[in-house]
């Protein structure tokens, strides 16, 4: 079954998943991985909300964008916060290889009325290969709000790069990476992603 999910990645040439967060959460992420809110609350991990309301009500999940970061959602979050933000790039193939059956594949933003209705009435459908295929339209394009929600947590072994929007933020992130003994995570200034 796993191979079918990996085939969808290959068919659409998806190599990366993206997760954006406040830079204030990065030290915790480098120490604990990208963790869901339920786990962080239970274990006492400190974090800054990136989605205080969480209208999809999936507290046990973490969210990823496919192929590119959800720029409109990031801009929305940036306007409501004075924090600097980072975009974490993860290896899509490795994530799907290990978590394909723990992911909800949402054609639209998970807090949209369409997805919330499915989450309330037929949640398991969103874990199917059909739901993953349905994220793409007939021409192979994703809705700009499409997202995946992974039940559980993801360690930093899947992190490849961290994108920032300034040299100052790059220095801060590089220091955090060094403090947490990671040598294989690259930090890149890429303003157009923000």
PLM regions with names:
Residues 1-63, 70-194:
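Active-site-proximal loop/hinge segments that shape catalytic or ion-binding/gating pockets
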């Amino acid at each position: 079954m796993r191979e079918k999910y990996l085939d969808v990645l290959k068919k659409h040439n998806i190599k990366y998943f993206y997760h954006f967060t406040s830079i204030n959460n990065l030290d915790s992420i480098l120490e604990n991985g990208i963790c869901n809110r339920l786990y962080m609350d239970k274990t006492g991990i400190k974090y800054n909300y990136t989605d205080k309301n969480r209208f999809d009500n999936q507290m046990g999940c973490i969210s990823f964008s496919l192929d590119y970061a959800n720029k409109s959602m990031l801009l929305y979050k940036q306007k409501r916060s004075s924090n600097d933000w980072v975009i974490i790039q993860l290896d899509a193939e490795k994530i799907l290889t290990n978590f394909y059956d723990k992911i909800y594949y949402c054609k639209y933003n998970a807090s949209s009325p369409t997805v919330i209705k499915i989450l309330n009435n037929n949640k398991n459908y969103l874990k199917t290969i059909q739901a993953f295929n349905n994220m793409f339209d007939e021409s192979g394009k994703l809705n700009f709000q499409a997202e995946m929600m992974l039940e559980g947590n993801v360690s930093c072994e899947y992190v490849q790069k961290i994108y920032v929007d300034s040299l100052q933020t790059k220095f801060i992130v590089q220091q955090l990476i060094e403090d947490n003994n990671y040598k294989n995570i690259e930090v890149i200034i890429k303003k157009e992603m923000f």
